[in-house]
Amino acid sequence: MSKLYEWIIPESDVLDKEEVQVKPPAMYKVVLNNDDYTPMDFVIEVLQKFFSMDMEKATQLMLNVHYEGKAICGTFTAEVAETKVAQVMMHARENEHPLLCTMEKA
């Protein structure tokens, strides 16, 4: 008969546990920029649809864009920020608005 614990790896074959430092991902701000042509209602719609804002928050941010020239819609990882910018830009173009959405390193 074979021994029950024959399969145990000799201690000399075990690797030491290595400490791994995990950095948080780089974050990016998604920014809406003001223009003189995109209707305010459309900007509110964009903020509700793509950034899950309620009417009050979307209206406040739209006013910030209007009066300050731009406003941050949120901060996300690079991939999420890129996707949100692309979605907003595509939606604006489909509706024939020149709304500009960009991303900046946070």
Swiss-Prot record:
**A biological-process GO annotation:** protein catabolic process
Q: Which InterPro entries match?
A: ClpS, ClpS_core, Ribosomal_bL12_C/ClpS-like
Recorded hits in Gene3D superfamilies, A to Z, give: 3.30.1390.10
Superkingdom of origin: Bacteria
State the function annotated in the UniProt record. Involved in the modulation of the specificity of the ClpAP-mediated ATP-dependent protein degradation.
Q: Which family does it belong to?
A: Belongs to the ClpS family.
Complex and partners: Binds to the N-terminal domain of the chaperone ClpA.
The protein's name is ATP-dependent Clp protease adapter protein ClpS
Species annotation: Photobacterium profundum (strain SS9)
Q: What is the lineage of its organism?
A: Bacteria, Pseudomonadati, Pseudomonadota, Gammaproteobacteria, Vibrionales
